[in-house]
């Protein structure tokens, strides 16, 4: 595949000058913080999945290929989730949100690691398309802490930079890469599953846990050929968020 991407030609990514990427200093308003604030309201949106955001707080997001989970498992998962949600009406407190993520997020991630579907992202050229798109606006629209491109899904740990929001950033990644991938490999129909799975980072220990999860995810995959390759990109994963943002 040809991965000589001209990102500025894509309207979804807008315009960016090279000088903006030479300057790695990230300017924030005094009130902005990448840390979760327990006394600050969260913004919640809902489609098929609930989504939470809180300004520039760090987020762990997973988005997957449209064919990455078998239909029967999606139906099973959806039925179990709907039953649980009927017993836990929203809005949720912090503990209920954590329970939701542990109960249903863990199951999805295990199925993804089973390697179902076309798994086109195990091709090195396809991975490069995703990696370059994720890195392109690092420091301008978001701070990219860590990511890994797995055969059928992508994990990203990042913090939005105002005025950009979690939802618009994720949508731009998915829209742009879907368009490029369809040009490169063909095919019809959705490339990515419409919705993503996201979790707010609530503490530094949570941040470290997620960074390590991303780092180790290739080794835990049930696809030995791919798991042996180096595909995790960790940006200062052993530093605190404050140190990265100085």
Model region roles, listed by residue range:
Residues 1-246:
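Short catalytic/metal-binding and nucleic-acid-binding patches
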């Amino acid at each position: 595949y040809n991965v000589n991407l001209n990102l500025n030609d894509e309207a979804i990514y807008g315009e960016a000058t090279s000088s903006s990427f030479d300057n790695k200093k990230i300017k924030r308003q005094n009130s902005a913080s990448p840390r979760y604030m327990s006394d600050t309201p969260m913004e919640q949106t809902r489609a098929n999945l609930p989504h939470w955001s809180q300004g520039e707080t760090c987020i762990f997001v997973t988005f997957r290929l449209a064919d990455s989970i078998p239909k029967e498992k999606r139906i099973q998962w959806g039925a179990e989730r709907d039953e649980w949600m009927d017993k836990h009406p929203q809005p949720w407190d912090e503990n209920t949100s954590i329970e939701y993520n542990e109960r249903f997020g863990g199951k999805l991630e295990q199925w993804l690691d089973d390697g179902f579907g076309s798994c086109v992202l195990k091709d090195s050229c396809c991975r490069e398309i995703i990696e370059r798109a994720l890195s392109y606006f690092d420091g301008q629209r978001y701070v990219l802490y860590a990511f890994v491109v797995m055969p059928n899904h992508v994990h990203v740990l990042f913090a939005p930079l105002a005025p950009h929001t979690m939802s618009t950033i994720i949508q731009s990644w998915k829209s742009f890469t879907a368009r490029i991938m369809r040009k490169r490999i063909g095919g019809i129909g959705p490339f990515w599953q419409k919705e993503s799975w996201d979790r707010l980072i609530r503490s530094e220990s949570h941040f470290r846990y997620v960074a390590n999860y991303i780092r180790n995810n290739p080794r835990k995959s049930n696809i030995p050929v791919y798991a042996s390759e180096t595909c995790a990109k960790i940006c200062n994963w052993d530093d605190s968020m404050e140190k990265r943002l100085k």
